């Protein structure tokens, strides 16, 4: 039986890189502050077994400043890499799991950029990486989705890499970015066995992720954390454009810890995986056992919305490329009657 244990969201202020020359200095500042927050919560916050950081907590959202894909890549990190190696030492020191997210480059995929969330184990290893699926399709980012070159990606890593879940002494852990606003993202992790989903988020309308998290947790009978970012520092955008409002939700959709602040903050709550497993074994209104995949599946297969393998030859270079695709998708959905054109 797994005893209940504390989990923490470290809502760090995040300094943004504004040009490639600043990369080393800014990431060092963000990383050092992150280490301080870990030490603080381990000393005064109940010694959590898992700590989570926001998306982009090392570099900031570099879409604010990057002029092209080359600058994006110059301001990104490798995972594993120098920065995660430092975090790994802290994970070993305290015997904890650390989750966070950042823009990533990978030598295996030249020219590509990923928005990646990761988990580091108490042994100091990167044991999970989840590369955001719904990123190119947002028409807001030029990070690659695994879906952009899906066939090649799955051939290299297997389908499990799309929804990575790790089996640990603390239960089965999944990790997600702001991608959790799509219900399929969280459900995909749950279908792979996830019981505790570590959400690393940054932007959005205030309270948006909190409300989404309550629904995602309830409908998937899973614990879910939303670690928002504190204030945005060193950027031309307002400091309060971050999400803040970090939240921890239980498997019934009940908020068990939260902060209503946009400033730096730490929240902690207890996770009871054994009780979750009992809840998932109930015979009445079991949200997972009741899923009718045979009925819902064909609807997705016939939808013909966002296409896979669109950028399998060359990584996306500009959001204008994605805008062309979204117009094609909308036209198909209008013609099928899925959507109705506005008057």
Identify the residue ranges that each predicted region occupies.
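Active-site-proximal beta-strand elements of phosphoester/diester hydrolases
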Residues: 4-24, 52, 116, 129, ...
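Conserved hydrophobic/aromatic positions in well-ordered beta-strands
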Residues: 8, 118-120, 247, 267
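Acidic/histidine-rich helix-loop elements
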Residues: 15-29, 76, 141-151
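Cys-nucleophile CN-hydrolase/nitrilase-fold catalytic domain and related Cys-dependent amidase chemistry
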Residues: 25-28, 35-132, 137-138, 203-215, ...
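Short, acidic/polar
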Residues: 30-40, 181-188
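CN hydrolase (nitrilase-like) catalytic-core segments centered on the catalytic cysteine
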Residues: 79-99, 171-270, 278, 287
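Active-site catalytic loop in hydrolytic enzyme cores
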Residues: 106-195, 205-215
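C-terminal beta-strand edge segments of enzyme domains
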Residues: 215, 229-343
């Amino acid at each position: 039986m797994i005893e209940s244990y504390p989990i923490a969201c470290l809502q760090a202020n995040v300094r943004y890189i504004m040009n490639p020359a600043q990369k080393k200095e800014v990431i060092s500042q963000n990383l050092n502050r992150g280490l301080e927050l870990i030490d603080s919560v381990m000393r005064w916050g109940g010694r959590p077994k898992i700590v989570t950081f926001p998306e982009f907590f090392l570099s900031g959202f570099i879409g604010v400043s990057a002029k092209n894909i080359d600058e994006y890549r110059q301001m990104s990190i490798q995972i594993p890499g120098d920065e995660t190696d430092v975090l790994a030492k802290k994970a070993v020191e305290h015997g904890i799991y650390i989750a966070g997210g950042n823009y990533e480059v990978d030598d295996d995929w030249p020219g590509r950029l990923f928005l990646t969330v990761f988990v580091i184990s108490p042994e100091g290893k990167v044991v999970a990486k989840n590369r955001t699926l719904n990123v190119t399709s947002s028409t807001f980012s030029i990070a690659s989705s695994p879906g952009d070159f899906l066939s090649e990606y799955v051939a290299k890593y297997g389908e499990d890499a799309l929804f990575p879940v790790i089996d640990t002494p603390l239960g089965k852990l999944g990790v997600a970015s702001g991608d959790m606003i799509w219900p399929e993202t969280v459900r995909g992790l749950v279908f792979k066995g996830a019981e505790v989903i570590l959400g690393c988020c940054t932007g959005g309308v205030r309270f948006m992720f909190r409300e989404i998290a309550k629904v995602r947790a309830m409908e998937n009978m899973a614990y879910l954390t939303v670690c928002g970012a504190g204030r945005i520092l060193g950027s031309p955008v307002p400091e309060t454009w971050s999400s803040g409002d970090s939240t921890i939700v239980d498997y019934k959709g009940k908020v068990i810890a939260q902060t209503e602040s946009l400033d730096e903050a730490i929240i902690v709550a207890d996770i009871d995986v054994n009780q979750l497993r009992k809840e998932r074994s109930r015979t009445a209104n079991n949200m997972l056992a009741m899923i009718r995949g045979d009925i819902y599946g064909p609807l997705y297969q016939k939808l013909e919305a966002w296409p896979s393998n669109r950028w399998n030859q060359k990584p996306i270079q500009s959001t204008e490329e994605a805008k062309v695709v979204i117009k094609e998708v909308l036209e198909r959905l209008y013609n099928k009657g899925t959507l109705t054109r506005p008057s």
